[in-house]
Structure formats: structure tokens, C-alpha cells
Amino acid sequence: MPQKKHNRVRSAKVLRKTSETDISVEVDLDGSGSSTVDSGVTFLDHMLTNFSKHSGIDIALRCKGDTGIDDHHSVEDIAIVMGSAILEALGDKKGIHRYGWAIIPMDEALARCSLDLGGRSYCVFHAPFSRAEINGFSTEMVEHFFVSLSRTLQANLHLRVLEGSNTHHKIEALFKAFAYAMKQAVHIIGTDIPSTKGMI
């Protein structure tokens, strides 16, 4: 799907520093899918690199977090900042497709994502995982990542694993489905606000 030519700059950089994390996220919605990701959580780096590659959104992300405790604060705060950065880069959302969906396989796993960038924050997530963690990444944080991101992105997000047994494959399929849904949703197809309300 070639990106519609436009003269807008759809990029943003957001910083967040708390007693638990120090995060910088920079995104370019009209990028080439290049990324530099250092989250402090290796498996999350892998997922976010995949998201960047398959969404076409350039990402530069750095996080220094209290991973000596666990990964919760880093994963949650990265999602918060990523959502904020993408929302800022979207600007007034004129001409965007707004909606996106994808069903993506990863070997035996199959995941579906549907999203709406219409300004209404809601996340529905269904994905059972047989493993509690992968290389220091708590699998319960997958849902929390998407819930946190949907809030600051102001997006309605539905994610579901339809098939699968391997936890790694199921999570990767979810992130790739999200990537392709996002690629479609941010794609510019016109010049109007995609809502009868006149704003989103």
C-alpha cells in the first residue's frame, strides 16, 4: 500500500522521566520501518523492532528502568510514551484511513488485531499464554502493554490469538498484527477528518 503523497511532517518525540523510568521515544509515521530500540527488556526490543519494520513507522526508543525489580514499570511506561508519541505525530488526523485490521500467522499461531484511531480509548484482549515469562519478559505484560498504549493513543484496540501453542509465536503474531493494522490506520487516503463529527 503506497503512502499518499503529502507535505505534512508526521513525527514526534516524547520524553518521560519518573522515579521508576527515564524514557525517550521518537516516531516517524511516514518512515521506512527502521528502528533503534533499547528498552532494557530484550524480548520487548524484539517485538518493537518487528512492530517498526512491519508498520513502516520509524522508531528511536531508549528506556532506563528499574528492571532490577521487574519489567513492569519499563513495559508499562514505554507503552504510555509510544502511544503519546504516535498520537502527537498524527496531528489533526486529517485524511487518515482511521481504521485498520490484520490477521497474521506465525507458524502454528494466528493473531488478529482491529483498531480505530477515533479518539476512544478501549482495549479488548484475549490471548492465553502457557509460559509466565520469556527471557525476563513477563507474558502478563503483553496485555498491559496494549491496554496502556490504547489509553494514550486514544485508540479502540481489539487483539485476539485465534490459534497457537508456542508463547513466543503467539506474542510475535500479536505485535505483527498490530503493526499491519496500524500501517493501514495511519495511511493517508484523503484530506478530510474521517468522522461525521468533524473531529476525532
Curated annotation (Swiss-Prot):
Q: What is its main location?
A: cytoplasm
Q: What is its EC number?
A: 4.2.1.19
* The reaction(s) this protein catalyses: D-erythro-1-(imidazol-4-yl)glycerol 3-phosphate = 3-(imidazol-4-yl)-2-oxopropyl phosphate + H2O
Recorded hits in Pfam families, A to Z, give: IGPD
Give its localization.
Answer: Cytoplasm
The top EC class is lyase
Which pathway is this protein assigned to? Answer: Amino-acid biosynthesis; L-histidine biosynthesis; L-histidine from 5-phospho-alpha-D-ribose 1-diphosphate: step 6/9
What the entry lists under PROSITE patterns is as follows: IGP_DEHYDRATASE_1, IGP_DEHYDRATASE_2
What is one cellular component GO term in this UniProt entry? Answer: cytoplasm
State the superkingdom.
Answer: Bacteria
The GO biological-process annotations, alphabetized, read as: L-histidine biosynthetic process
Q: Which InterPro entries match?
A: IGPD_sf, ImidazoleglycerolP_deHydtase, ImidazoleglycerP_deHydtase_CS, Ribosomal_Su5_D2-typ_SF
Which GO molecular-function terms appear in the entry?
imidazoleglycerol-phosphate dehydratase activity
Q: Which PANTHER family match?
A: IMIDAZOLEGLYCEROL-PHOSPHATE DEHYDRATASE (PTHR23133:SF2), IMIDAZOLEGLYCEROL-PHOSPHATE DEHYDRATASE HIS7 (PTHR23133)
Q: Per the similarity annotation, which family is this?
A: Belongs to the imidazoleglycerol-phosphate dehydratase family.
Annotated protein name in UniProt: Imidazoleglycerol-phosphate dehydratase
Instruction: List the gene name.
Output: hisB
